Amino acid sequence: MDWGTLHTVIGGVNKHSTSIGKVWITVIFIFRVMILVVAAQEVWGDEQEDFVCNTLQPGCKNVCYDHFFPVSHIRLWALQLIFVSTPALLVAMHVAYYRHETARKFIRGEKRNEFKDLEDIKRQKVRIEGSLWWTYTSSIFFRIIFEAAFMYVFYFLYNGYHLPWVLKCGIDPCPNLVDCFISRPTEKTVFTVFMISASVICMLLNVAELCYLLLKLCFRRSKRTQAQRNHPNHALKESKQNEMNELISDSGQNAITSFPS
């Protein structure tokens, strides 16, 4: 797996992210990717070789291991990181499309006053508004869904986040209920809790960023509405509307008073 490519893609999105989004990217690569690549692979590197059962029945050990660990912790975490990071591609593609359209308009002479050259367009920080706001918030929403889904799958597959010292297995072809042991269960439990905690932190950061974007949108719309109300044209329209209402009211009163009794 090429983690450098993943870092390049998400690092490009980091330029256009909010402050909370930049913290999320830092947590992803320092507390999850680095731990997974550097430490977790060393801890889980011997998981099947050192899985021992107190029986010599052929096939019993393999069947019990497959029953208790249907998917490797490392592979599941790697798959989770891929799914969680993939929505960032939506933002990257949207920004690339925006820059392409801006460069095309610049070549046709429509954006000459805003940019000096094409390199200036590439260096521009795209603001999260308009259609990009919807793309960005959608990517955050999908990240939250993926984080929650993988945490549930992890809990469902392994019956919790704690690795026991002894596993009881009575699946065929085991002759009876046998005891199986995994290597370094305490250390693996610590790493498991750490990775789950990092997932929870990332999910909370995503929720906080989503709330921040929603509040910012409401504030921007409120400010825009207030500016429109304070605009001279808006005041002139209100003045004309009030005059029309007064004329209609006066004409109605005159019609009532002139009506023969």
From Swiss-Prot:
<dbReference type="GO" id="GO:0016264">
    <property type="term" value="P:gap junction assembly"/>
</dbReference>
<comment type="similarity">
    <text>Belongs to the connexin family. Beta-type (group I) subfamily.</text>
</comment>
<dbReference type="GO" id="GO:0005921">
    <property type="term" value="C:gap junction"/>
</dbReference>
<feature type="transmembrane region" description="Helical">
    <location>
        <begin position="23"/>
        <end position="45"/>
    </location>
</feature>
<protein>
    <recommendedName>
        <fullName>Gap junction beta-6 protein</fullName>
    </recommendedName>
</protein>
<keyword id="KW-1003">Cell membrane</keyword>
<feature type="topological domain" description="Cytoplasmic">
    <location>
        <begin position="99"/>
        <end position="131"/>
    </location>
</feature>
<dbReference type="GO" id="GO:0051015">
    <property type="term" value="F:actin filament binding"/>
</dbReference>
<dbReference type="GO" id="GO:0008017">
    <property type="term" value="F:microtubule binding"/>
</dbReference>
<comment type="function">
    <text>One gap junction consists of a cluster of closely packed pairs of transmembrane channels, the connexons, through which materials of low MW diffuse from one cell to a neighboring cell.</text>
</comment>
<keyword id="KW-1133">Transmembrane helix</keyword>
<dbReference type="InterPro" id="IPR017990">
    <property type="entry name" value="Connexin_CS"/>
</dbReference>
<dbReference type="InterPro" id="IPR038359">
    <property type="entry name" value="Connexin_N_sf"/>
</dbReference>
<dbReference type="InterPro" id="IPR019570">
    <property type="entry name" value="Connexin_CCC"/>
</dbReference>
<dbReference type="GO" id="GO:0005884">
    <property type="term" value="C:actin filament"/>
</dbReference>
<feature type="topological domain" description="Cytoplasmic">
    <location>
        <begin position="1"/>
        <end position="22"/>
    </location>
</feature>
<feature type="transmembrane region" description="Helical">
    <location>
        <begin position="76"/>
        <end position="98"/>
    </location>
</feature>
<dbReference type="GO" id="GO:0005922">
    <property type="term" value="C:connexin complex"/>
</dbReference>
<feature type="transmembrane region" description="Helical">
    <location>
        <begin position="132"/>
        <end position="154"/>
    </location>
</feature>
<dbReference type="GO" id="GO:0016324">
    <property type="term" value="C:apical plasma membrane"/>
</dbReference>
<dbReference type="GO" id="GO:1903763">
    <property type="term" value="F:gap junction channel activity involved in cell communication by electrical coupling"/>
</dbReference>
<dbReference type="InterPro" id="IPR013092">
    <property type="entry name" value="Connexin_N"/>
</dbReference>
<dbReference type="InterPro" id="IPR000500">
    <property type="entry name" value="Connexin"/>
</dbReference>
<comment type="subunit">
    <text>A connexon is composed of a hexamer of connexins. Interacts with CNST.</text>
</comment>
<feature type="topological domain" description="Extracellular">
    <location>
        <begin position="46"/>
        <end position="75"/>
    </location>
</feature>
<dbReference type="GO" id="GO:0032496">
    <property type="term" value="P:response to lipopolysaccharide"/>
</dbReference>
<feature type="topological domain" description="Extracellular">
    <location>
        <begin position="155"/>
        <end position="192"/>
    </location>
</feature>
<keyword id="KW-0812">Transmembrane</keyword>
<dbReference type="GO" id="GO:0007605">
    <property type="term" value="P:sensory perception of sound"/>
</dbReference>
<keyword id="KW-0965">Cell junction</keyword>
<dbReference type="GO" id="GO:0048839">
    <property type="term" value="P:inner ear development"/>
</dbReference>
<dbReference type="GO" id="GO:1990349">
    <property type="term" value="P:gap junction-mediated intercellular transport"/>
</dbReference>
<keyword id="KW-1009">Hearing</keyword>
<dbReference type="GO" id="GO:0051602">
    <property type="term" value="P:response to electrical stimulus"/>
</dbReference>
<dbReference type="GO" id="GO:0042471">
    <property type="term" value="P:ear morphogenesis"/>
</dbReference>
<feature type="topological domain" description="Cytoplasmic">
    <location>
        <begin position="216"/>
        <end position="261"/>
    </location>
</feature>
<dbReference type="GO" id="GO:0048487">
    <property type="term" value="F:beta-tubulin binding"/>
</dbReference>
<dbReference type="GO" id="GO:0071333">
    <property type="term" value="P:cellular response to glucose stimulus"/>
</dbReference>
<dbReference type="GO" id="GO:0008285">
    <property type="term" value="P:negative regulation of cell population proliferation"/>
</dbReference>
<feature type="transmembrane region" description="Helical">
    <location>
        <begin position="193"/>
        <end position="215"/>
    </location>
</feature>
<keyword id="KW-0472">Membrane</keyword>
<dbReference type="Pfam" id="PF00029">
    <property type="entry name" value="Connexin"/>
</dbReference>
